[in-house]
């Protein structure tokens, strides 16, 4: 049975490993560590005593922004991202958050998950994300009313 708990200081090496595997242009370890604190709701997904995913979300008043969500590739496509996202949304709602924002690469297959969970496309940021080959890719800005 998967567990969802708050991220702790000792989790960062594993989070960084997942980040490197799961994203086209991953965050650095420093960026992961810098996105922590009282304005954040950061969760880890544990299965069989191992962290297999995480979400990093910043809250400001009644809005939140999901900065990063990642599931280890071996566990993708099994509903784990949906489970983590649903728990995050539930905890945000309990804290009085009304709107959850995110941006996602146009090519990211997770877009279907966000749409299925109630997110709507709000805007396109042209040439926002870098690609490994030196090019750029659009970001899709999405919002969900909790």
Give the ranges of each region predicted by the language model.
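Acetyl-CoA-dependent GNAT
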Residues: 9-74, 85-87, 91, 95, ...
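Conserved acetyl-CoA-binding loop-helix of GNAT-fold acetyltransferases
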Residues: 77-90, 112-116
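N-terminal beta-strand motif that seeds the catalytic metal site of vicinal oxygen chelate
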Residues: 96, 103-105
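Conserved catalytic-core motifs of GNAT/GCN5-like acyltransferases
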Residues: 101-103, 115, 120-138
């Amino acid at each position: 049975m998967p567990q969802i708990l708050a991220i702790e200081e000792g989790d960062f090496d594993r989070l960084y490993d997942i980040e490197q595997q799961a994203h086209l242009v991953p965050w650095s370890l420093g960026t992961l560590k810098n996105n922590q604190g009282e304005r954040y709701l950061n969760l880890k997904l544990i299965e069989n005593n191992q962290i297999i995913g995480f979400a990093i979300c910043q809250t400001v008043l009644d809005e939140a922004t999901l900065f990063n969500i990642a599931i280890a590739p071996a566990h993708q496509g099994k509903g784990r991202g949906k489970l983590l996202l649903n728990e995050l949304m539930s905890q945000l709602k309990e804290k009085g958050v009304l709107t959850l924002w995110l941006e996602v690469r146009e090519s990211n297959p997770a877009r279907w998950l966000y749409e299925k969970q109630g997110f709507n496309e709000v805007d396109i940021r042209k040439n926002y994300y870098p690609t490994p080959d030196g090019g750029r890719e659009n970001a899709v800005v999405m919002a969900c009313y909790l």
